[in-house]
Amino acid sequence: MVNKRMQTLLMQLRQQGIHDERLLQAIEAVPRERFVDEALAHKAYENTALPIGAGQTISQPYMVARMTELLQLTPTSRVLEIGTGSGYQTAILAHLVDHVCSVERIKGLQWQAKRRLKQLDLHNVSTRHGDGWLGWQSRGPFDAIIVTAAPPEIPDALLEQLDEGGILVLPVGEQFQTLKYVQRRNNEYHIETVEAVRFVPLVKGELA
């Protein structure tokens, strides 16, 4: 039954314009039901966002795929994720690159995500409890940065931690949000608007 629902989801993603086969294989390899509450497991393969507690959500599979595809990852890409959340996006990234760094401001979510990733034998992830606005400077610079919550403006620290040629993908805005694609070229930042989106806000600071 799960396999059938997964195949339906993959078909929907292809119909929505996701064509990177390596990415689709990574999505197929990650059991989304493991990243949501048991009571919501029957909705795991619906193309919708779901609550994960602490006022946070696991993103819609299309948005996970769209943002990941925009990063143009190779196996050796150095990747930073801001907002570990449930760990689902992290797991997709871990199937695509050699190592992932991920920052989560809510300690309980970080701990749960770390446990889930370990249970799935995904050991190529470093998680950190901290303020996502600050990135993870000691692990940078990064070839790709993905942000899974929306700041009102692009955090300077994330721009600074982007390597030459690197790509930053994030939602930006408050009441109205758009997905931004940022590439650093010749020490300049080229910003494109991709589409309208709706994410939880990227809050400064960290919670125990």
UniProtKB/Swiss-Prot annotation:
Name the reaction it catalyses: [protein]-L-isoaspartate + S-adenosyl-L-methionine = [protein]-L-isoaspartate alpha-methyl ester + S-adenosyl-L-homocysteine
Disulfide-bonded cysteine pairs: these are: none
Q: Which Gene3D superfamilies match?
A: Vaccinia Virus protein VP39 (3.40.50.150)
UniProt subcellular location: Cytoplasm
Keyword GTP-binding carried by entry: no
Which molecular-function annotations from GO does this UniProt entry contain?
A: protein-L-isoaspartate (D-aspartate) O-methyltransferase activity
Query: Keywords on this record?
Result: Cytoplasm, Methyltransferase, S-adenosyl-L-methionine, Transferase
Listed GO CC annotations = cytoplasm
An example GO BP is:
protein repair
Mostly located where? cytoplasm
Its Enzyme Commission number(s) read 2.1.1.77
CDD domains given for it?
Answer: AdoMet_MTases
The active site lies at 59
Query: What task does this protein carry out?
Result: Catalyzes the methyl esterification of L-isoaspartyl residues in peptides and proteins that result from spontaneous decomposition of normal L-aspartyl and L-asparaginyl residues. It plays a role in the repair and/or degradation of damaged proteins.
What does the similarity note say?
A: Belongs to the methyltransferase superfamily. L-isoaspartyl/D-aspartyl protein methyltransferase family.
Protein name (database record): Protein-L-isoaspartate O-methyltransferase
Q: Which organism is it from?
A: Yersinia pestis
The organism's taxonomic lineage, starting at the top: Bacteria, Pseudomonadati, Pseudomonadota, Gammaproteobacteria, Enterobacterales
Name of the gene: pcm
